[in-house]
């Protein structure tokens, strides 16, 4: 996996319809949460230390993520994921 500098990566919170639709409903950037905080929160495998993969949001992560987004996170209404995208 190619290592990218932090200014080349944007991490976002994405929410999708629950089954059966699974369509993307919305997203918000997570640029106010430092990578170190996301790593501590999601505990990625050693193969993905910079969180370039997609992570499903579980109840224990909601409180910290909610501090960074305007959308009200509702795990009963949507499926949530933290994803990383290359910028530029």
Task: For each feature predicted by the language model, list its residue ranges.
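A short beta-strand micro-motif
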Residues: 11-16
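Solvent-exposed strand-loop boundary residues in beta-sheet-rich modules
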Residues: 19-21
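Short, flexible N-terminal segments of the mature chain
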Residues: 23-47
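Acidic, low-complexity intrinsically disordered segments
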Residues: 42-88
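Short consensus segments that form the blades of beta-propeller domains
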Residues: 2-5
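Short coil-to-beta strand junction motifs in C2/discoidin
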Residues: 7-9
